[in-house]
Amino acid sequence: MNTKKLITFILWAFVPMVGIGIAMHLIGGSGAGVNTDPADINIVQTLIASALSAAAMFLPLIAVIMTQLTFKEPVLKGLDINFKINKWWVIGALLIPVLTMATVGMSLLMPGAKWDTNSELMQMSLQGMPEGFGVWALIGISMISGLIAGITINGLFAFGEEIAWRGFLLKEFKGKKFLTTALWTGTIWGLWHAPIIINGHNYPEHPVAGVFMMTIFCILFTPILMYFRQRSGSVIIAAIMHGVFNGIAGISLLIISPFNDLLYGATGLAGFITLLIANICIYLYDRHISKENIYTSLID
């Protein structure tokens, strides 16, 4: 591992992200909280914050390019950017909706959680739907649209991150243990979010604790994304899975009320438990069923 190169990448990724955080702070934060009355939402502020968050997703890609140019190396060589579709693409993309619904179930087991299909947010979401459309129809549509978005627009934005986290960093950690690499990559990925988390992104009710929570989430999600990236031989599936996640992870907000961003949802404790169980299941499959052991191997 080239430590100087890694530090250069981190600086290129983190410093502009601080700028995004400052810009978000100047407009008053990320916008609405999880329990904010829809009538009180500042639409302009929320849209600007969303645009800043979306733009931030390309900062890791820029950091990779600038780092490679600094060290006079081919910009995207060896990062496994290919579109050779195989079964791992399909399994990876479909795994995210399964994990999302498992997280909803886990959230409902948390203290104070209540299944609430009459929440104002749910009723707003149902407006404009054909008569007779209920909660499960909305969830189904959300899942399908999330999958489509993950393959298209969301996947494109997620690629801006994944080319760094599951592309560049995997290459830099070549020869290191899989889980060691996952721990370091997840920590870097999580802390990179800090400037926008502190401004209310993902954890609007607990922005300071949210920095720690987001880091834990990224550490737990990273082995799963790395596993599918390694099995598929392409960083693209990591971008698709990341994109699908971004498209459907908010389903918990629709059906659980009042919402606690530290306990419920994909980035709360319920999500952590779900991801931990998923990691254990993949590890057991990898260790006892698969012919190719990745979790216990070195990054090649």
Predicted regions and their residues:
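Alpha-helical transmembrane segments in multi-pass membrane proteins
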Residues: 20-70, 81, 87-97, 117-141, ...
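Hydrophobic transmembrane alpha-helices of multi-pass small-molecule transporters
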Residues: 21, 61, 194-197, 246-251, ...
